[in-house]
UniProtKB/Swiss-Prot annotation:
This is Protein GrpE. Residues 1-67 are annotated as: Disordered. It is found in: Cytoplasm. The lineage of its organism: Bacteria, Bacillati, Bacillota, Bacilli, Bacillales. PROSITE patterns: GRPE.
Length: 220
């Protein structure tokens, strides 16, 4: 009985179909293809924008055009701001140059006319000296005093000349309202019309600036 069972089992093993080599080799390949497909689907799910870009070139071109337009708008805005800043810089530079020029002119004028205040204060003193020197006397002591007065007067004039103070020429010159102040008119002959015929008070100028115009009589 036991021997019959063994024979039956042996027959069953012989009747089983063997697994083909081709089927065994194709199973791993199918599994690899399936895994690659699942991986591609997963990447497409994680990056739908890339998938859509690959799938739709027209949409990608539209996005690039929009980005380019934005970049151009930003460049135009920056160029406009740069131009405005350049204008502001030029205005500030011009204002600064004007300030420097005015400051330089003021400094030069202050140096050039530094004696103006003192000279103006001394003009009445010069007038008094001139009046004193016009006095005529036969007294020797008075003449000696007048000689001393004249020396002081000349020294004072020399000091003022060194600072640029000059006497304005008047008699015989054409009347100039910038240099002369007409206080009288005369019909005296021998002079061209509108000519200074007499100086009543001397005028002075400091370089090219008038300290005091000369008071004169003018022919008609």
């Amino acid at each position: 009985m036991e021997q019959g069972d063994k024979q039956a089992t042996y027959n069953e093993l012989e009747t089983e179909q063997p697994v083909s080599k081709e089927g065994a080799d194709s199973q791993p390949e199918d599994e690899a293809i399936g895994a690659a497909s699942e991986h591609a689907d997963a990447q497409a799910g994680e990056n739908p924008e890339a998938a859509s870009t690959t799938a739709d070139p027209a949409e990608q071109t539209s996005v690039e055009a929009e980005e380019l337009a934005k970049a151009k708008a930003q460049v135009a805005e920056l160029e406009e701001k740069l131009a405005e800043m350049e204008k502001r810089y030029l205005r500030l530079y011009a204002d600064f140059e004007n300030f420097r020029r005015r400051a330089r002119q003021e400094m030069e004028a202050a140096e050039k006319y530094r004696a103006q205040s003192l000279a103006s204060d001394l003009l009445p003193v010069l007038d008094n000296f001139e009046r004193a020197l016009k006095i005529e006397t036969e007294n020797e002591q008075a003449k000696s005093i007048l000689q001393g007065v004249e020396m002081v007067y000349r020294s004072l004039l020399d000091a003022l000349r060194k600072e640029g103070v000059e006497v304005i020429e008047a008699v015989g010159k054409p009347f100039d309202p910038h240099l002369h102040q007409a206080v009288m008119q005369t019909d005296e002959g021998g002079y061209e019309p509108n000519t200074v015929v007499e100086e009543l008070q001397k005028g002075y100028k400091l370089k090219d600036r008038i300290l005091r115009p000369a008071m004169v009589k003018v022919s008609q």
